[in-house]
Amino acid sequence: MHIAEGVLPPVQCAIWFAAAAPFVVHGAVQVVKQIKHHPENRLLLATAGACTFLLSSIKLPSVTGSSSHPTGTGVGAVLFKPPVMAFMGLIVLIFQALLLAHGGITTLGANTFSMAIVGPWVGYGAYVLNKKLGGPLALGIFLAMFLSDLSTYCVTSFQLAFAYPDPSSGVLGAAEKFLGIFAISQIPLSVAEGILGILLFRFLFKVAGPQLQALGVRIGNKRTANAEVPEVAHV
């Protein structure tokens, strides 16, 4: 998904930077508030960032100028809500661009918009909807991980299509081609990421159950950690 350096025209790079900036600034404020008012959640915050960094560093060949990989942003979206992931995702993308040659600085705005903004919001929306409908926690986590990944690549496909429209079918035709290529690798990766998310949250409930309870990650309407942690072990 990381669009490489020099792939997008300068004007489009500037547009994506401008589109991402308000979300990132708001996210930075939320991260500072989270650390200041809830210092006990710093390890969970670090876990969310590490998950995004590690999973999105897996680089598989795909569309020229981009790549396929999991995103890992669903974890942070479920734990701390999407605004936090806008800022943390930007930090991850900067490190990857500078240290791993994964992505680029000029395309940082576009990559942030797709992976750190749209992906977390779509995944979180699915998680909340599942919760309101009374679905199991495991399903909500799976959907958050699965859809945050897929939606990221949908946005990336259109970003590339705007830069390289098809001569005959235009932007929509190009987007269809990019989506088709990404789907080959990304659908299986998204499913695997969803399953990994369930396993990760099982572990987190065992080691940080009270913190997850306080963040609102719970089964049903029960509020006591003792009642919920054993149940999560079987989701």
UniProtKB/Swiss-Prot annotation:
It is a multi-pass membrane protein. This is Cobalt transport protein CbiM. InterPro entries: CbiM, CbiM/NikMN. One of its GO terms (biological process) is cobalamin biosynthetic process. Belongs to the CbiM family. The keyword Membrane applies. One of its GO terms (cellular component) is ATP-binding cassette (ABC) transporter complex. It is found in: Cell membrane. Part of the energy-coupling factor (ECF) transporter complex CbiMNOQ involved in cobalt import.
